[in-house]
Design a protein with these regions (language model features):
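Well-ordered beta-sheet/strand-loop patches within structured domains
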Residues: 2-141
Length: 141
């Protein structure tokens, strides 16, 4: 019988935190090596043409999911939105949600919000960011 290899993140909470930091370091290193130029210019001036607009329901009743997670998601989205508002993405620049918003931590005011983990509803600090990133994805399409 072949033994299955354990990943670092499977060894417990501390190992998970270490694995997470390793992956962030790896991603940042790769970004630098590939000389990716991320959009980071903001402008208060309105652009002359509105290409797309969309309104999305923030608070939803989702089966047996604790409604407080929906309220916290609204708080999390309100914290992230100003980091994206008025961002200019010029030719040759790359948009990165995580470079603009950064890590969602309790220290920054983010709350425990709804997340999906292994096809099941769950919760974690900063939960709800997927709704914003999905909205951005659909607006770009």
């Amino acid at each position: 019988m072949e033994m299955q290899r354990l990943h670092l993140y499977q060894l417990g909470p501390r190992a998970y935190a270490l694995s997470r930091k390793k992956e962030i370091f790896k991603r940042n290193f790769q970004d630098r090596m590939h000389r990716i130029h991320f959009a980071q210019t903001y402008s208060e001036a309105c652009l002359p043409v509105v290409v797309n607009k969309h309104n999305s329901l923030i608070r939803r009743k989702l089966g047996k999911v604790d409604q407080q997670l929906q309220e916290n998601k609204a708080v999390n989205l309100a914290l992230a939105a100003p980091r994206l508002t008025h961002l200019l993405i010029r030719p040759g620049e790359t948009f990165s949600f995580w470079h603009c918003v950064g890590e969602c931590t309790a220290e920054k005011g983010y709350r425990e919000g709804l997340t999906i983990s292994g096809n099941h509803p769950s919760s974690s600090i900063g939960g709800g960011m997927c709704q914003m990133t999905n909205l951005i994805h659909w607006m770009v399409l």
